[in-house]
């Protein structure tokens, strides 16, 4: 059965009854955001962007992950930007997924090192792809920041490759799109760029154990 966020609490098969261990479904971006909160004790409110093979996000409010009434808050990957755009895995066209997931870099995740070596060494084709990606990402961030005016954390597989020049370019693009004067103070690179999903998935169980000790 194909699972989408918001459907995980309405499964048609009894997963829990099939496993001898406690289990829960957590959206990967929510897990990553939990890890981010663990790494940043002073972080209170933020919008976490998981920039990986697929695009995902999590909304952090008062150090809690907000999933919404139906479980699909922050599933920004399926915001339709272009009805005639590329087909998304959800079956619709032109979703943010088709513009801001790492698949748009036209390389396998295993080849990200090579791709960014080309970008930083001024390879023309690689830079064209990267600039197009940053423009689309800036467009998405600007739209979301108008809705949730908080810190935006750039995480996922992309995070270790981001440099200050990339952040500066995002601010520049956002400034050209937003109707408001924006301070360059709301974009941050993830503090937990590696193993954040697995760590975040485990942390609630660790916390539960510590509370029982």
Model-derived features: positions:
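Glycine-rich phosphate-binding loop and adjoining helix at the ATP-binding site
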Residues: 1-45, 163-176
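ATP-binding/phosphotransfer module of carbohydrate and carboxylate kinases, centering on a glycine-rich
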Residues: 21, 40, 87, 92, ...
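Short, solvent-exposed coil/turn elements at secondary-structure transition points
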Residues: 29-31, 82, 193
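Short, active-site-adjacent cap segments at secondary-structure transitions
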Residues: 31-33, 56-57, 66, 159-162, ...
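Glycine-rich phosphate-binding loop of actin/hexokinase-like ATP-binding domains
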Residues: 44-99
